[in-house]
Amino acid sequence: ICTGDGLSLAMQAGVPLMDTEMIQYHPTTLAGNGILLSEAARGDGAYLINSEGERFMEKYAPEYMELASRDVVSRAEQTEIDEGRGVDGCVFLDLRHLGKKFIEDRLGYLQEVALEFRGIDLSEKPIPIKPGMHYIMGGIKTDLNGATNVPGLYAAGECANVSVHGANRPVSYTHLRAHET
């Protein structure tokens, strides 16, 4: 969950921030609490449906459907919600067609989260999701060694701006951050 605490602390100390206008939204956060639901569900064949039961990604990314990039999927979900095809500010992640055994074997974590936080068995009912703020592409301005303009104050990891990802960080690129310096 992106809270921005590191950026706030740095800014209060007089450290400049860079490229904070570039924000990535994750397309599958759990309605109500924002828990991030793994994209493995979509990778394993889950559908995104609206309040009408329509697999809406065909309108937005017909070649990729649910496997489109995070920004495309997040915008599509928000469009469906804004145009009245959502329910309570959400669309749905539908795994019912995958079957109970597949869900338990391949997506057990998702099943546990759905049961614990929404009381939903994913093999029986779609789960409400919405785009949620996930990652800020920019961050605390540093040099190549992670030093800021405040002597002795360093920033590293996801709070630091290292200008690697541009406007849209692909899935699993967090690992790239370990190889940046």
Which sequence ranges carry the predicted segments?
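Glycine-rich beta-alpha-beta "Rossmann" dinucleotide-binding loop(s) and their flanking helix/strand
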Residues: 1
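Glycine-rich phosphate/pyrophosphate-binding beta-alpha loops
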Residues: 26-28, 160-173
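Acidic active-site catalytic centers that drive phospho-/nucleotidyl reactions
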Residues: 5, 19, 50, 143, ...
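Short secondary-structure transition/capping segments
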Residues: 29-34, 135-136, 167
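Short amphipathic alpha-helical face segments that pack within enzyme cores
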Residues: 4-12, 177
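Conserved small/polar residues in nucleotide/adenosyl-binding loops
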Residues: 174-181
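An anion/pyrophosphate-binding glycine-rich loop and adjacent beta-alpha core
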Residues: 9, 15-121, 172
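A glycine-rich dinucleotide-binding beta-alpha-beta segment and adjacent secondary-structure elements
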Residues: 106-163
